[in-house]
Amino acid sequence: MNAPTPAPSPADVIPAPVGLLAELTHRCPLRCPYCSNPLELDRRSAELDTQAWLRVLTEAAGLGVLHVHLSGGEPTARPDIVEITAKCAELGLYSNLITSGVGGALAKLDALYDAGLDHVQLSVQGVDAANAEKIGGLKNAQPQKMQFAARVTELGLPLTLNSVIHRGNIHEVPGFIDLAVKLGAKRLEVAHTQYYGWAYVNRAALMPDKAQVDESIRIVEAARERLKGQLVIDLVVPDYYAKYPKACAGGWGRKLMNVTPQGKVLPCHAAETIPGLEFWYVTDHALGDIWTKSPAFAAYRGTGWMKEPCRSCDRREKDWGGCRCQALALTGDAANTDPACSLSPLHAKMRDLAKEEAAENPPDYIYRSIGTNVQNPLSEKAPL
């Protein structure tokens, strides 16, 4: 009798995706210096049309996707955002609108509600209007955001406030908590900047010091206790001050896929920064084939690609080696241990880099923009 074929390791099994990040457009009225979009932004002329997005959603539902995050850029800049939202509802997909709340967002909100929108995630750059508008690069944005948030709660939609934290607004963490309560939000994300995309370019302008980070964590933990049952507060700490890396996107190719405005499918926001990866487009391949067969998703899925110390670490199926894009940017090799991990030989250097930049006077922001040739000030610096 032939011996039974051994079951594959759980790390090698390709799970069904849970979430789809639908980057409907890169157009956005805000110009945030920490934007996670790539430096080379897709133009409107390259965006997928309505029928392509409806097909993507249908295929996503067939794959087992549960949540669709309608994002951008500013997703309400799309004239077909209501139709796309209605398709999510028709397919039973939980829809989360990730929005700046400015421009045409308020004018479309009631129609989105009628179409079956499930949840709204509103970005707030600061509590003080002048500071918020300096960070976002758009005057008179704050009153629009407050009007938008008020209408969200009037409609009975669950509201999450998203506050990306950096040295320019870290002093406002208590104010973000108070604002979330005032607006009737169900959830607040206190998300320290993750240094990819435009945030990597602006790292020296955005990096807070360790004492500020520790104090912000203390404030959040106290507020969690005080507001238990009223407000859920999610906290994302900066990798540069962490002990262990986070499981980027829940693990490469394990939970989430990101479809760009032109239909390129990525395992994470910044995956395009890794040279040599072959990305497939929804215009050429079915979404299911991309998830299971595309070279980019296979490249760092599971644990087989890992080097030491990740390969033998008991955390390898918890954080999946951390962020591949950060490993590349800071060590020169995407397969290296993420230096956010205390087990990385470069961890101390990463901490020192953060300490040095936080101690310097911050340079001016390089604002996110389409069609501008951005010179990355870090491009001439050697990795750690």
From Swiss-Prot:
It is an enzyme of class 1 (oxidoreductase). One of its GO terms (molecular function) is iron ion binding. CDD domains: Radical_SAM, SPASM_PqqE. It holds the Pfam family SPASM. The keyword Protein biosynthesis does not apply. Interacts with PqqD. The interaction is necessary for activity of PqqE. GO terms for biological process: pyrroloquinoline quinone biosynthetic process. Its cofactor is [4Fe-4S] cluster. HAMAP family: PqqE (MF_00660). Residues 14-226 form the Radical SAM core domain. Catalyzes the cross-linking of a glutamate residue and a tyrosine residue in the PqqA protein as part of the biosynthesis of pyrroloquinoline quinone (PQQ). This is PqqA peptide cyclase. Belongs to the radical SAM superfamily. PqqE family. PROSITE patterns: MOAA_NIFB_PQQE (PS01305), RADICAL_SAM (PS51918). Keywords: 4Fe-4S, Iron, Iron-sulfur, Metal-binding, Oxidoreductase, PQQ biosynthesis, S-adenosyl-L-methionine. [4Fe-4S] cluster binds at residues 28, 32, 35. InterPro entries: 4Fe4S-binding_SPASM_dom, Aldolase_TIM, MoaA_NifB_PqqE_Fe-S-bd_CS, PQQ_synth_PqqE_bac, PqqE-like, Radical_SAM_PqqE_MftC-like, rSAM. It catalyses: [PQQ precursor protein] + S-adenosyl-L-methionine = E-Y cross-linked-[PQQ precursor protein] + 5'-deoxyadenosine + L-methionine + H(+). The gene is pqqE. The keyword Cell wall biogenesis/degradation does not apply. Pathway: Cofactor biosynthesis; pyrroloquinoline quinone biosynthesis. Its EC number is 1.21.98.4.
